[in-house]
Amino acid sequence: MQLNLAGRHALVCGASEGIGRAAAEALAGLGADVTVLARREGVLVEVAAALPRVHGSQRHGHVAADSRDGDGLRAAVSALVAQRPVQILVNNTAGPPGGTAHEAQPERYVEVFRQHLVANQILVQAVLPGMKAAGWGRIVNVISTSVKEPIPNLGVSNTVRGAVASWAKTLASELGPFGITVNNVLPGYTRTRRLEQILAERSAATGKPAEDIAKGMLATVPAGRFAEPAEVAAAIAFLASPAAAYVNGINLPVDGGRTRSL
C-alpha cells in the first residue's frame, strides 16, 4: 500500500492538542512536511519541534492564527502558501458548547458557522492554487458523527457540522477533476478536551457524576471504550495518502461502531 507522503506539505488545523496534534504526528510519520496551525504560538512551536522526521529533508513549521478572525486567517495562510504550497489540508476546529437548538441565539449560529464553514472555505481557497498546480491534493475535514445522527444537546454543533459535510460533498464533485479529493472523518467519543467538556456540561445539567455520564456513553459503543486521538488520526492519514486516491466525497465514522445508521 502506497502511504509515502515525502515531498508533500500538509497544513493541519487545531494542531495544538487532541486529534489535530495526532493528525500532524501521523502525517509527519508518513514523511510529509507539516505546518501546524492554531491560536497558541508557544504551544505550536513545541508541537512542530516534536513532530517525527523520518527522512532528512523534512521541514516542519507553525502558523499562529484564529479561525474566528477570517481576515487574519486568510493573511496568515496566504503568506504560508506563497513560500510553500500546500497539498494536504486538514480542517479541524473545536466544537461549540452544548445546548438545545431551539434555545440558541441566532447570533450563536452565525458565530459558529463563521468559525467552522467560513474558516474552512478561507483555507481551501488559499491552498487550492497549489493543489491545482500539482494536480494532486487532499482535503480532510474532521467533523463529527452528528453528521449522520444528531447528538442530543449539541444543537448548534449538529447544525453547523451538517452544513460542513454538505459543503465538502459539493467540493468533492467540483475538485475531483483536478486530482483533489475531499473527505470527512467523523470521530466518535474520543479522549480529548472536547470530551471532557461534554462530560462536564452533561454532569452540570443532570447533577450526575461525570463518571456515570461516561459509563452511559460507553454503553452505546460496541467497542466498549473511548477512541484515542491517534486512532482518528490514522484514518485522516490514510485519506491523505496516495493509497486513497480513489476515495472521494465520503463520511468516514471512527466511532467504535456507535453510529447505527448505514
Question: Which stretches of residues belong to each language-model region?
Answer:
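Substrate-binding pocket helix/loop in short-chain dehydrogenase/reductase
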Residues: T100-F113, I139, M217
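Conserved glycine-rich cofactor-binding loop
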Residues: H9, S16-E17
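Short, small/polar-rich loop/turn modules that mediate ligand/substrate recognition or access, typified
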Residues: G176, T181, V247-G249
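Alpha-helical segment proximal to the catalytic Tyr-Lys
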Residues: P129, S173-E174, A245
